[in-house]
Amino acid sequence: MSNYVVAMEAAWLVRDVENSDDAIGVAVSEAGKRLNDQDLDYVEVEAGVTGCPACGEGLDAAFLAANTALVGLVLELTVFNADSDEHAQRIAKSEVGGALRDVPLEVIDVIEDGDAPAEEA
């Protein structure tokens, strides 16, 4: 059994904001609060980055229209003692998905973590 770092992308809707910086701040704060309420404080929440289609430069993953924003968040956690990367993905989606109901989640990266010590079962 191995440990895996699983990164997921979440689409977070924020209402009544006037700019993308505010939207990102609200999205990160709300997601963090919902995760912490479920004792998932080990999940790291960051604003996502998307590439400019013209130049490839990284831009904040936030789209704002009519004072409503769709913010892309990156959620990252370490899954201990998983049988495979697919197993780690299922565990991560189950843990985070339970706390963030009605929030679309997609696994974007899974890395086997050889540095973290395996927890005893």
UniProtKB/Swiss-Prot annotation:
Belongs to the UPF0212 family. PANTHER family: UPF0212 PROTEIN MJ0068, UPF0212 PROTEIN TK1194. NCBIfam families: PRK03922.1. This is UPF0212 protein VNG_0879C. It comes from Halobacterium salinarum (strain ATCC 700922 / JCM 11081 / NRC-1) (Halobacterium halobium).
